[in-house]
Curated annotation (Swiss-Prot):
It is an enzyme of class 3 (hydrolase). Its EC number is 3.6.5.n1. It is a peripheral membrane protein. The keyword Membrane applies. This is Elongation factor 4. It comes from Paraburkholderia xenovorans (strain LB400).
Length: 597
């Protein structure tokens, strides 16, 4: 066991984490040169294309150190994005050490810091590594100062390397072997294994990636999940060297996979503890929590007959993504669809993209909403994730909205515009620190404001230099109202939004005027109204198309003309009673885009 090292790599997006992983695999001979391709561990096309890591992956490698000893290195690749922070904390808790990769030309960024703090809280040893030192813009001294300043770990002897050219990667491995402690654990104790990740394979069912903390596991053992209590016989166990390789046993300190013929992913929850049925552990490993979706949106097929196909696609995605929630919902305007829950905005985009790309779906997405806590007059509290479920204003005692703590990092030139943005979004400033040229701002902002377009606007006002991460803090009472859109007195449910009262008038006017442009003129007048409860806050009229009924009258008596006009008016009135206004699909899409502005 003294020769096992479990480590993961922490880095901000694009700081070269996956490339470094590739080099390490190559040096340790995990794959032949022929099988080597860039970003070996990012197995999803979308991961490669966006250059982000979504699922955790592992590789068990052997490394012959300079002192002649052979070490078993278990590398656990972690996602870097804030939406997947729970997966990160699980990956990190399976390690004893973490390589903190910092781009020598860019310095420390927000998500690096967020994940690094998670690592330090879990008691993982952090080893700083400066990557991309082959770039002409690299400034290692500056980066070292930032690491010490912002994160507060000693970085004077940080290893310098360039993952692209392979320079200095062996020094990184030497530092790993020297500084990361070997795993603690007792191979004889009752089995405790932490599920780091799980995914669905078409041939063998659910594959669980585990770190054995105590005990030993062999094929044919019966295992039990401690969170759900489900039991399964083990079929295969082994390790990934990125390719899978079956073994006869996995014992304390090792990281490997278990295949046990599990049919659905919900049974193998990330962070759960696996133990043996006939010799169970006394208690599960700490830190398990159910992941709750934070952002909700409605997904509707453009063609109504694709509803079943959409349901199948969501089921298939759910096999590989336990944090995706969905339930069917019906909208009068958009027909049948699903209300889906996501961890955050990136997660939502990825799910949408995978549906469109891997399953060929055409989707309409309603504006994302967050979960509000509503205290009703009768004393009950309900959680509202869909504007349509919001009770009438007369029944509401108070509404509480989720508040998130946002950490922002940016060069000091952009501080002014970022502060303005945060204030527009009803943020309150908590803290502001200068670290050399970088500034760290901490704000508390309502989550509903963050999910709409905060990230895009932050990037555009800071020319892409600002980075952010956020975490949920608490529910807080707020003056939020539901704005409904009426067309000729009928509610259009898909366009209801929940906004802060201060923005409700502007929002109502904006949507009403947009609808006026987009709804084609009818044979009768159409009134578009925005309402809060029974109060109308904005109105637009679309005038009727009308025939010139006086054309055949040439001169003649005024009473004759009046009679014809009255007759036309009565006809229009009758039409208005029976007619219903069809809203074209383009109008919906355009209105949902207004909300992104």
């Amino acid at each position: 066991m003294d020769h096992i090292r479990n480590f993961s790599i922490i880095a901000h997006i694009d700081h070269g984490k996956s490339t470094l992983a590739d080099r390490i695999i190559q040096i340790c001979g995990g794959l032949s040169d022929r099988e080597m391709e860039s970003q070996v561990l990012d197995s999803m096309d979308l991961e490669r294309e966006r250059g982000i890591t979504i699922k955790a992956q592992t590789a068990a490698l052997t490394y012959k150190a300079r002192d002649g000893q052979v070490y078993n290195l278990n590398m656990i690749d972690t996602p870097g994005h804030v939406d997947f922070s729970y997966e990160v904390s699980r990956s990190l808790s399976a390690c004893e050490g973490a390589l903190l990769v910092v781009d020598a030309s860019q310095g420390v960024e927000a998500q690096t810091v967020a994940n690094c703090y998670t690592a330090i809280e879990l008691g993982v040893d952090v080893i700083p590594v400066l990557n991309k030192i082959d770039l002409p813009a690299a400034n290692p001294e500056n980066a070292i100062a930032e690491i010490e300043d912002v994160i507060g770990i000693d970085a004077t002897d940080a290893t310098r390397c360039s993952a692209k050219t392979g320079l200095g990667v062996e020094d990184v491995l030497e530092a790993l072997v020297a500084k990361v402690p070997p795993p603690k654990g007792d191979p004889e104790a009752p089995l405790q294994a932490l599920i780091i990740d799980s995914w669905f394979d078409n041939y063998v069912g659910v594959v669980m990636l585990v770190r054995i903390v105590n005990g030993t596991l062999r094929p044919k053992d019966k295992i039990r999940m401690m969170a759900t209590g489900a039991q399964y016989p083990v079929e295969h166990i082994g390790v990934f060297t990125p390719k899978s390789k079956n073994l006869e046993s996995l014992s304390a300190g090792q990281v490997g996979f278990i295949i046990a013929g599990i049919k659905e992913l919900a049974a193998a929850k990330v962070g759960d503890t696996v133990t043996l049925v006939n010799r169970p552990a006394a208690e599960p490993l700490p830190g398990f929590k159910e992941v709750k979706p934070q952002v909700f949106a409605g997904l509707y097929p453009v063609e109504a007959n694709q509803y079943d196909a959409l349901r199948d696609s969501l089921e298939k995605l759910k096999l590989n993504d336990a944090s995706l929630m969905y339930e069917p919902e019906v909208s009068q305007a958009l027909g049948f669809g699903f209300r889906c829950g996501f961890l955050g905005l990136l997660h939502m985009e990825i799910v949408q993209e995978r549906l469109e790309r891997e399953f060929d779906m055409d989707l309409i997405t309603t504006a994302p909403t967050v979960v509000y806590e509503v205290l009703q007059r009768d004393g009950t509290t309900i959680m509202v994730e869909n504007p349509a479920k919001m009770p009438e204003p007369s029944k509401i005692e108070e509404v509480r909205e989720p508040i998130v703590t946002v950490n922002l990092y940016m060069p000091q030139d952009y501080v002014g515009s970022v502060i303005t943005l945060c204030t527009q979004k009803r943020g309150t400033q908590i803290n502001m620190q200068y670290h050399g040229r970088q500034v760290q701002l901490t704000y508390e902002i309502p989550m509903g404001e963050v999910v709409l377009d905060f990230f895009d606007r932050l990037k555009s006002i800071s020319r892409g230099y600002a980075s952010m991460d956020y975490e949920f803090k608490e529910y807080r009472a707020a003056d939020v109202v539901k704005v409904d859109m009426l067309i000729n007195g009928d509610k259009v449910d898909a366009l209801s939004v929940i906004v802060h009262r201060s923005q409700s008038q502007y929002r109502g006017r904006e949507v009403a005027s947009k609808m006026r442009e987009l709804i084609p003129r009818q044979m009768y007048d159409v009134a578009i109204q925005a309402t809060i409860g029974a109060n109308i806050i904005a109105r637009e009229n679309i005038k009727a198309l009308r025939k010139n009924v006086l054309a055949k009258c040439y001169g003649g008596d005024i009473s004759r003309k009046k009679k014809l006009l009255e007759k036309q008016k009565a006809g229009k009135k009758r039409m208005k009673q029976v007619g219903s206004v069809e809203i074209p699909q383009e109008a919906f899409l355009a209105i949902l885009r207004v909300e992104d502005k």
